Amino acid sequence: MKPSIYSLTRQEMIEWAEAQGEKKFRAAQIWEWLYRKRVQSFEEMTNLSKDLIAKLNDQFVVNPLKQRIVQESADGTVKYLFELPDGMLIETVLMRQHYGLSVCVTTQVGCNIGCTFCASGLIKKQRDLNNGEIVAQIMLVQKYFDERGQDERVSHIVVMGIGEPFDNYDNVLKFVRTVNDDKGLAIGARHITVSTSGLAHKIRDFANEGVQVNLAVSLHAPNNDLRTSIMRINRSFPIEKLFAAIEYYIETTNRRVTFEYIMLNEVNDGVEQAKELAELLKNIKKLSYVNLIPYNPVSEHDQYSRSPKERVMAFYDTLKKNGVNCVVRQEHGTDIDAACGQLRSNTMKRDREKALVENVQP
């Protein structure tokens, strides 16, 4: 199976071209065709020799993904189900924000973190996505708009789709550097957010990388007992270890950390828990920000329900009174398979049911 050319960084592209006996500027031409002109085949690279195009075709594909399903919401959200070369499925989501087009990318097939409220973890991790498969998600979303003649450009990226990004650390870092490259898509580092469920040692590594992207931490609870009950990862990285890493990140980068907090009715959404959260954040208030997330119910996790608006606002008001910067996240795509992993999970379920029916037919 040939790799995607998107898996190469610009420096790797230069090294590849030189290994083929080509001049360095040929790599720059290929890079421009891919990321500025956004072609989908090597034959469209009209200033390259036939010999070089043949070498590219022999060693690479352009986009390794196949679009299976597209769901469009009334609010402009678009959810994509993509098929990987090995037949596995992933999700990507485009969200229209007041500041531009934001794409949420997937980094793994399945997830091993085991959050008890999440559709992504219903299917265990099967493999990591490589850098090219992550980049390809952005390129296919952009192609979706290019083909419609819509003069819109992906401006923001959130690495918050299926999987734990820091469990696929090297590929995610390579992806960030590829989409941030000023000769390519040139998506600003401060327009890119990488999320983690709390791999403390990787947060420390990330602090030392020198990348200027944003960090978000899926917290979802203000104490160890509650967090362990809804997020299995807290057994390995309890809040004390997690916050030591977060404080190291802030001291090293002087960058703000966003805390994601999903609102589960009568589980983690009480005023006392808001006070606990404010106390937990007291030493990093100036460089922290809490994102309160309305819960999208998942049929497989029917023990949870969405917090009523009055409970959300009481939680929000308590944080504000205690000096915590926070916001209630705007919802997107509530009229489609909105929860992370839900479209993929529902599609796989339908595919299994279809296969069973076909197998029993005479």
UniProtKB/Swiss-Prot annotation:
Keyword Thylakoid listed: no
Pfam families documented for this protein: Radical_SAM, RlmN_N
Keyword Disulfide bond part of the UniProt annotation: yes
Disulfide bond entries: C104-C340
E.C. number(s) listed in UniProt: 2.1.1.192
GO biological process terms held by the UniProt record: rRNA base methylation; tRNA methylation
Binding site for S-adenosyl-L-methionine: G163, E164, S195, S218, L219, H220, N296
Active site residues per record: E91 (proton acceptor), C340 (s-methylcysteine intermediate)
Cited InterPro entries: Aldolase_TIM (IPR013785), Methyltransferase_A (IPR040072), RlmN_N (IPR048641), RNA_MTrfase_RlmN (IPR027492), rRNA_lsu_MTrfase_RlmN/Cfr (IPR004383), rSAM (IPR007197)
Broad EC category: transferase
SUPFAM superfamilies on file: Radical SAM enzymes (SSF102114)
Annotated positions binding [4Fe-4S] cluster: C111, C115, C118
Function: Specifically methylates position 2 of adenine 2503 in 23S rRNA and position 2 of adenine 37 in tRNAs.
UniProt record similarity statement: Belongs to the radical SAM superfamily. RlmN family.
Note: Reaction proceeds by a ping-pong mechanism involving intermediate methylation of a conserved cysteine residue.
Protein's UniProt name: Probable dual-specificity RNA methyltransferase RlmN
Gene: rlmN
